From Swiss-Prot:
Name of the coding gene: rodZ
GO molecular function per UniProt: DNA binding
Function: Cytoskeletal protein that is involved in cell-shape control through regulation of the length of the long axis.
Name assigned to this protein: Cytoskeleton protein RodZ
Keyword annotations from UniProtKB, A to Z: Cell inner membrane, Cell membrane, Cell shape, DNA-binding, Membrane, Signal-anchor, Transmembrane, Transmembrane helix
Region feature (Disordered): 148-245
Topological domains annotated Cytoplasmic: 1-111
DNA-binding region location: 30-49
Compositional bias of kind Low complexity: 165-201, 218-240
Positions on the Periplasmic side per record topology: 133-336
Domain HTH cro/C1-type: 19-71
Domain remarks in the Swiss-Prot or TrEMBL record: The helix-turn-helix (HTH) motif in the cytoplasmic domain of the N-terminus is involved in the formation of spirals to maintain the rigid rod shape. As this protein is anchored in the cytoplasmic membrane, the HTH motif may contribute to protein-protein interactions to form the RodZ helix, which is localized beneath the cytoplasmic membrane. The C-terminal domain may be critical for determination of the rod shape by probably interacting with enzymes required for synthesis of the peptidoglycan layer, including PBPs in the periplasm.
One annotated Gene Ontology cellular component of this protein: plasma membrane
Subcellular location: Cell inner membrane
Native source species: Escherichia coli O7:K1 (strain IAI39 / ExPEC)
Length: 336
């Protein structure tokens, strides 16, 4: 009967009360229990008062109670019903995790990298195209400007009258002047013959008869000096040798052959424009002047240049498709 009464009394006590009674029977204080269990005094007090701290998980609280029971020699099986009430197991709240696998993150990163790479590539291509278009447009404008200038200069040259016939008429006048003294001498020689008459009657008869004979004499005498005589100090013209001799070749001659239409401007050392204008396909140009020559060529691929008998290299202008600006020195060293 006494054993059953004691068992019923123990069941009536809570877990904290039973632990406190056992501690007091052993003569231990809350400080001593806390030191042995490595707990705070407040935690031991909460356990004896059947309080569950909010910041303490139920799993840890059940472990502390079991350690406390072993310390005060109380069987753990007797405390299990009370533990279910004092420290019930609470399901931990687990937040649903987002399924971001490593493969998906890597794929997303690679996608952004590819997008950025394509964007940079498009920007580079766009800038290159814009630069090429501006350079091409500037070259076309420059060629058009130079062509307009050359056409304007040609129009101005055509509008000015060139006295080409003056020299020829002067030469003709110089060629005909030596014959006039011969004619005067011929007439002078005829007049004394007419005046030396013995009597006036004969003179009158001669005046009536002589003019036809004088006309015959004059017509016969006049062509003879023109054909046989030359003025004093005048040298005969070498007409036969003029058609045979050829001018000497200038070592500074500039020879150009054109395979296509090309605009061209050539200036010598004195600043004189030897040529400025458009040359057609299959045309050729031979210029002489004072070296060095300054050349501007609109289409370098359409012209072949020979200077001092050697070809001039225009490959660097052909590769870049630019207007060629170069200077040909006396030693044939083209410089841009």
């Amino acid at each position: 009967m006494n054993t059953e009464a004691t068992h019923d009394q123990n069941e009536a006590l809570t877990t904290g009360a039973r632990l406190r009674n056992a501690r007091e029977q052993l003569g231990l204080s809350q400080q001593a229990v806390a030191e042995r269990l490595c707990l705070k005094v407040s935690t031991v007090r909460d356990i004896e008062e059947d309080k569950a701290p909010a910041d303490l998980a139920s799993t840890f609280l059940r472990g502390y109670i079991r350690s406390y029971a072993r310390l005060v020699h109380i069987p753990e099986e007797e405390l299990l019903p009370g533990l279910e009430k004092q420290a019930p197991l609470r399901a931990a709240k687990v937040a649903p995790m987002q399924s971001f696998s490593l493969g998906k993150r890597r794929k997303k990163r690679d996608g952004w990298l590819m997008t950025f790479t394509w964007l940079v590539l498009f920007v580079v291509i766009g800038l290159s195209g814009a630069w090429w278009w501006q350079d091409h447009k500037a070259q076309q404008e420059e060629i058009t400007t130079m062509a307009d200038q050359s056409s304007a200069e040609l129009n101005n040259n055509q509008s000015q009258s060139v006295p080409l016939d003056t020299s020829t008429t002067t030469d003709q006048a110089m060629a005909t002047t030596p014959t006039s003294p011969v004619d005067t001498t011929a007439t002078n020689t005829q007049t004394p013959a007419a005046t030396t008459a013995p009597s006036p009657t004969v003179d009158s008869q001669q005046n009536a008869v002589v003019p036809p004979s004088q006309a015959n004499v004059d017509t016969a005498a006049t062509p003879a000096p023109a054909a046989t005589t030359t003025p004093d100090g005048a040298a005969p013209l070498p007409t036969d040798q003029a058609g045979v001799t050829t001018p000497a070749v200038d070592p500074n001659a500039l020879v150009m052959n054109f395979t296509a239409d090309c605009w061209l401007e050539v200036t010598d050392a004195t600043g004189k424009k030897l040529f400025s204008g458009m040359q057609r396909k299959d045309g050729n140009l031979n210029l002489t002047g004072q070296a060095p020559y300054k050349l501007k060529i609109g289409a370098p691929a359409a012209v072949q240049i020979q200077y001092q008998g050697k070809p001039v290299d225009l490959s660097r202008f052909i590769r870049t498709n630019q207007v060629a600006r170069l200077t040909l020195n006396a030693e044939q060293s083209p410089a841009q």
